[in-house]
């Protein structure tokens, strides 16, 4: 009797195990899901192949390719990169709009505390001018906001790619650089203005400094020191006397 019970129990268990599983409860990697993934992969591959053939037969215009490259280089930047003060420079500005121009639209307004103080001093001088004294610069300089700087030289002397547009919190910011350079290497025929040409040789030249800027390093955005024009100075050398 006991053998008959054992035989019936074993037959019942074998019958349960032999029932096929439903596709709705199919585990990951079962034929039901693998066939679906294989079908989607095949469709994706076929779509990419068709798109590639279409691009080869009808290549995109040059302007469109440049636009696509520009949008691809617009990498999303982590806002944490801007939280460290040591990366901030008064000569580097990230803005969605061009910086304001001055009234004459030839030089720009450098929004800095020191420059604000200088503007107040200049305003006082204009209010109370001194008629018996002339004030002239040794060299003539011009300052501009550079908006489309794509390449620069880093602190190691190597060329780097500068990010023009930065995607931050779904807003596109342009990276501006405030640069100052000489308007003319010889403001007067003898060189620098106000230098005694009988004893000195002089000329005006642009000097550089390094500022932190967002650059491209592979497919990542990184801070690097790059060289920009920052001042116009006078270089003098003593003339040799002929005996």
Swiss-Prot record:
It is found in: Secreted. Keywords: Cleavage on pair of basic residues, Disulfide bond, Glycoprotein, Growth factor, Lipid-binding, Metalloenzyme inhibitor, Metalloprotease inhibitor, Protease inhibitor, Secreted, Signal, Toxin. GO terms for molecular function: growth factor activity; lipid binding; metalloendopeptidase inhibitor activity; nerve growth factor receptor binding; toxin activity. It holds the Pfam family NGF. One of its GO terms (cellular component) is axon. Homodimer; non-covalently linked. This is Venom nerve growth factor 1.
């Amino acid at each position: 009797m006991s053998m008959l019970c054992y035989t019936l129990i074993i037959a019942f268990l074998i019958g349960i195990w032999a029932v096929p599983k439903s596709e709705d409860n199919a585990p990951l990697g079962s034929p039901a899901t693998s066939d679906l993934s294989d079908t989607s992969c095949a469709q994706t591959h076929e779509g990419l192949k068709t798109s590639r053939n279409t691009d080869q037969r009808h290549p995109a215009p040059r302007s469109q390719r440049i636009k696509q490259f520009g949008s691809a280089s617009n990498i999303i930047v982590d806002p944490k990169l801007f939280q460290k003060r040591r990366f901030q420079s008064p000569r580097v500005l990230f803005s969605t709009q061009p910086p304001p121009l001055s009234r004459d639209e030839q030089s720009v307004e450098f929004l800095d505390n020191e420059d604000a103080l200088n503007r107040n001093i200049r305003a006082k001088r204009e209010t109370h001018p001194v008629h018996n004294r002339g004030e002239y610069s040794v060299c003539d300089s011009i300052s501009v906001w550079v908006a489309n700087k794509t390449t620069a030289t880093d602190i190691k002397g190597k060329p780097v790619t500068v990010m023009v547009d930065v995607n931050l919190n779904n807003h596109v910011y342009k990276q501006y650089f405030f640069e100052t350079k000489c308007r003319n290497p010889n403001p007067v025929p003898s060189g620098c203005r106000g230098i005694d040409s009988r004893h000195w040789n002089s000329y005006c030249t642009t000097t550089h400094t390094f500022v932190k800027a967002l650059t491209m390093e592979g497919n990542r955005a990184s801070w690097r020191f790059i060289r920009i024009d920052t001042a116009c100075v006078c270089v003098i050398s003593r003339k040799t006397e002929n005996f």
